[in-house]
Amino acid sequence: LLRTSTLASDSLDLLSLLYSDKNYSQPLSVGFKGNPHMGSLVLNSMIGGPAYNAFKSTFSNGDRIFIISSICGGTGAAGFPLLLQNFRQSDNNHIRDSYIGALSVMPYFRLSDPGQTSDIDSNDFMTKTKSALTYYTRQDFTNLYDSMYYIADPDKQTHPYTNDEIKQENKAHIIELLGAYSIFHFAINNSHRGTVNEYCIGSNDDKINFDTIGNSTKQALGHDLTSLHLLSKLHNTIKENKNNLSFCKVNNFNSSFFSDPFFTDAENGLELFLNDYYQSWIKELDENDRGFNPFDLKLKGKFNTLINGNGHYVE
């Protein structure tokens, strides 16, 4: 990206102020590890590339843009402002004039104290967050987006730090679930330029359920998530007992029906999703220090006490 051999000496002097020797040699395959000055350089080189041009050529009137980024590190903190400014300066009028929303995820976990070889120190998360917010709240920047969503939970959950993207195992977290919900909120709302949204749970409890997650989120998630959870609990039982269940006989829910690739496909089958992905996801949400436990995961058989809390959700 930086062809230093062709630069004048005064340009090299300037670069030495911005980038250390470690920056020059740091691999970027997993992001910029808390170095937004590196991220902005790399991401800017992608503007005008094949992927960006494909997006630009297919974007049409009425389409919307939603940018998801973290704010305490390098990749997201650098990429969000860069993308936003490029969209608003695009020569595609549909992109330039579109509704643009963004989710900025602030710290919601800490890492164990870093060692000498660690590239990331979570003690710097809040400092970097405050630095980014100073820029994000400037009027010339707020005029670029229509709706901004902020979410954080800085005082919960410490993860052991591993300087390896494969071995660094972070559990699914309620912040990620609520952050994803902001996409749906943005899709159905026409906010005026510079609108800011912040999330507040109904009660500051270590374990959150449908009673304490907040009324609008409860209404949005309660019915559908409960239906999905019931399906995950009942599907295998129904399949195993299909020959003895009258509704299976009446509706031809037989061996041929349950052998359909819709259920059994090794990559996209429903059973793979329910047994391997959904069950581990809902379990990880429950295990965090700030846990989301809408259901009694230990319950077997009768489901009249399946839903934690008072058991009511809005249909």
Question: Model-derived features: where do they sit?
Answer:
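Terminal, contiguous helix-loop blocks that mediate binding/assembly
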Residues: 1-63, 71, 83-86, 94-315
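Gly/Ser/Thr-rich loops at beta-strand to alpha-helix junctions
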Residues: 69-79
